[in-house]
A protein has these predicted regions:
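Residue-level preference for the first positions of well-ordered beta-strands
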Residues: 4, 143-149
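Short, basic/glycine-rich phosphate-binding loops at helix/coil junctions
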Residues: 17-20, 105-117
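Loop-to-helix element that buttresses phosphate recognition and phosphoryl-transfer chemistry
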Residues: 8-62, 66-67, 118-133
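Glycine-rich phosphate-binding loop signature in dinucleotide/nucleotide-binding domains
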Residues: 46-48, 139-144
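Active-site metal-binding loops of divalent metal-dependent hydrolases
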Residues: 10, 145, 152
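General small-molecule cofactor/ligand-binding pocket signal
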Residues: 5, 80-82, 193
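Phosphate-coordination/substrate-recognition cap region in phosphate-metabolizing enzymes
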Residues: 38-108
């Protein structure tokens, strides 16, 4: 059983200005985002992390830095930077204000048929899902708790894939800045334990339960977590 935490970067200056940052350099966190990153470190306090898989973009690294500072150097998890977790290449849309993009004829495609969307001089959202799931499967084949730090649309594509829903339902999924989504992988199937969580301590959900038989979904919904 592998447990994976999907973390979206905290609130950035591009989020604040309503700009589609894409892969632009120098996109840092706002004051609010820095507070979110500190709160995230508190929420993950005491969690034994085996490895962190992270986008190469600065805002993701700034999000996870407060957590790393709380971990003694000798105990810090290995960090793997992977392009598969990078932000969507929005091509010519990069750096533009979202309000101006609403008027673009392709905006309706993004909203209604994201599987068909290919950003001008950029990449297609369907391609994003393929590379994102490649990173997830890499993490799932590792031992111990894995953390993935990435971007909103990338994580939305992962959630859609894990749920087995069509990519055209992608926009029905919400992933907020500094949110945590928790996945379990039993060797053949993924399950979502929590989605877009921005407030509760995560240590209990981060625990990996070792069982001879992998956990299965129960009819009737199951009894929930054991009460202490």
């Amino acid at each position: 059983m592998t447990r994976i935490l999907l973390i979206r970067h905290a609130h950035s200056v591009a989020n604040d200005r309503g700009i589609l940052a894409g892969r632009s350099a120098g996109v840092i966190l706002t004051e609010h985002g820095s507070k979110q990153a500190s709160d995230l470190a508190e929420r993950l306090k005491g969690v034994a992390i085996a490895k962190i898989h992270i986008s190469p973009l600065e805002r993701c690294h700034l999000t996870i830095n407060p957590l790393l500072k709380k971990i003694p150097v000798k105990n810090r998890p290995k960090i793997v930077i992977t392009e598969d977790l990078s932000e969507v290449d929005y091509g010519k849309w990069t750096g533009k204000k979202l309000v101006s993009l609403y008027r673009d004829k392709l905006w309706k495609v993004v909203q209604d048929r994201p599987s068909a969307m290919y950003f001008p001089d950029g990449e297609g959202l369907a391609n994003v899902q393929v590379r994102a799931m490649r990173a997830v499967h890499t993490a799932a084949n590792e031992s111990g708790l894995q953390i993935i730090v990435s971007h909103g649309d990338v994580i939305k594509s992962i959630v859609a894939a894990v749920l087995g829903t069509h990519m055209d339902n992608f926009q029905k999924i919400v992933i907020d800045p500094a949110s945590i989504t928790v996945l379990d992988f039993d060797g053949s199937n993924f399950r979502i334990l929590t989605l877009n969580n921005t407030s509760t301590p995560i240590a209990e959900l981060a625990k990996i339960v070792s069982k001879k038989r992998p956990a299965r979904a129960l009819l009737g919904g199951g009894a929930g977590r054991k009460r202490k």
